[in-house]
Amino acid sequence: MTRSSIPSIALIVIVLVTLVWVSRDRLMPGASREHASEKPATAVSGGATSAMFTSRAIGDPPKGEERPQIAHVAIVDLDRDGLNDVLVCDSLRNVVTWIRQATRGTFTESVIAGVSAPAHVEAIDFDKDGDLDLVVAALGFLFPNNNRVGSVIVLENDGQQKFRSHYIADRIARVADARAADLDGDGDLDVSVAGFGYDDGETSWLENKGGWKFEQHVLQQLSGPINAIPVDINGDTFLDVVALVSQEWEEIWAFINDGKGNLTPRMLWGSTNPDFGSSWMTMVDMDKDGDPDIVYANGDAFEYAPPNSRPWQGVQWLENRGDLKFELHRMIDQQGVTSPEAVDLDGNGDLDVLLVNANNDWDNPAAPSLLWLENDGKMQFTMHPIASSPTHLLTLAVGDLDGDGKPDAVTGGMHISRPYDRIGCITGWFTRR
């Protein structure tokens, strides 16, 4: 959602240049460039499943006329008391918050730290002292901006859930994603970084030099990285980085690690459509064959005023065929979708997909904001709308909130466009089955 809500002259020029550029052969070996519409969607439309969840607002409600701008949520037991909590990146109030579940079903929100336009938060024991620290990606400014106002912050936990801020990278391209992993094999945690920027961006990693000192290594200078996920994509035991690059590129890249922090770029997939609208990616073994696949949504429409979806938007999964070759399977044609999460929602042993909608026809009261793609066990999917309120849902996390062993969910609303009649900040969705 970091893309412009009003098309700029610069963006129009970039798109025109891109239309010429895509006719050239710039594919890496093993990569493919295609339009997802060339692959028919495997999902069919099923009935509504609102009875699957009960929902309620958790955390602090909006104040007065506030319109929430929640960029990311995560489910984690931060204080390790056996009850899952919720972490929130609130880009309206410029804070990272903790919605603590102190007793079962009772949620209380408190501010952890002030951060300028936080976009992603990850809980991990970064300093290996036995408690959970937080790695935060910060845009610096929510809306499009070419200034280098991005940062990566580690919030160090003192063991009592009091946090000290360490800015391990500052004044870099607006950061949409940052995740911890040992990328150079020296035993400490480094950080992969998606520097979205605007016209200028970069995918990079931050080498941990000790003493809270980090060195940035730029892997690729393309605008629009949304995700930078550490994962062993080729099965050689070394963590690579897989990046989703949006803007006019609309590509998925792998940076292959030799185990010592030397990462080589390799395109895994690219669209022929420079307006494809990449919105989010997650890595999961979707077909349970032992290697990581990619579940990938293209529902971004924030560059239009008002946000206006396109017919080619939807969700697909890229099947890992080995040797860095991926086969695209279109799952669903659906406008505005983002934040797909693979989860066995119906308990039948295969992975379904839960996802949200940030840009739909909200004047239609039935337009879904939360959807379930039901897997029939043969990788054919049936789409079920779950809810149509709140609207403008940008972020989704899955986990067991009520301790019944079944997957629940949390969503966050990004209400930067009309209508404003079904506003929600943080919503908990509790499985009934």
Segments from the language model and where they lie:
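Beta-propeller-forming repeat regions
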Residues: 4-433
